[in-house]
From Swiss-Prot:
Organism: Thermomicrobium roseum (strain ATCC 27502 / DSM 5159 / P-2)
InterPro entries, per the entry: NADH_UbQ_OxRdtase_chain4L/K, NUOK/Mnh_C1-like
Entry's Gene Ontology cellular component terms: NADH dehydrogenase complex; plasma membrane
Lineage of the species this protein comes from: Bacteria, Pseudomonadati, Thermomicrobiota, Thermomicrobia, Thermomicrobiales
Designated name of the protein: NADH-quinone oxidoreductase subunit K
Family the entry assigns: Belongs to the complex I subunit 4L family.
Assembly and interaction partners: NDH-1 is composed of 14 different subunits. Subunits NuoA, H, J, K, L, M, N constitute the membrane sector of the complex.
A biological process from GO: ATP synthesis coupled electron transport
EC number, as in UniProt: 7.1.1.-
Function: NDH-1 shuttles electrons from NADH, via FMN and iron-sulfur (Fe-S) centers, to quinones in the respiratory chain. The immediate electron acceptor for the enzyme in this species is believed to be ubiquinone. Couples the redox reaction to proton translocation (for every two electrons transferred, four hydrogen ions are translocated across the cytoplasmic membrane), and thus conserves the redox energy in a proton gradient.
Gene, per the UniProt record: nuoK
Family annotation (HAMAP family): NDH1_NuoK
Length: 102
């Protein structure tokens, strides 16, 4: 069995980021788009941890903890906005929300 290297972490991170980006670009539900953005943030965390693993330093892991804390705050604010939009418009479809703007 081979040892983990930064390549393994970066491949996983790239796959997660691409899945999240495709979700943001193709989905119409605001909640699904929000979850895909969170997936992209987690992909960044995996890459930070991978670089920290390769360099044998804790800096990347500490920075990943800060990103997790910021993502939690972003999740609270984002879900609050989504809930307010849903109460006001009775929809979570991005196309219908665009029509309200026009």
């Amino acid at each position: 069995m081979s040892e983990l290297s930064a390549t393994h972490f970066l491949l996983l991170s790239a796959a997660l980021f691409i899945i999240g980006m495709v979700g943001v670009l193709t989905r119409r539900n605001v909640l699904v788009i929000f979850m895909c953005i969170e997936l992209m943030l987690n992909a960044v965390n995996v890459s930070l941890i991978g670089f920290a693993w390769e360099l044998h330093q804790l800096t990347g892991q500490v920075f990943a903890l800060f990103v997790i804390a910021i993502a939690a705050a972003e999740a609270v604010v984002g879900l609050g906005i989504v809930m307010a939009l849903t109460r006001r418009t009775d929809t979570v479809d991005i196309d219908e929300l665009r029509q309200l703007r026009e």
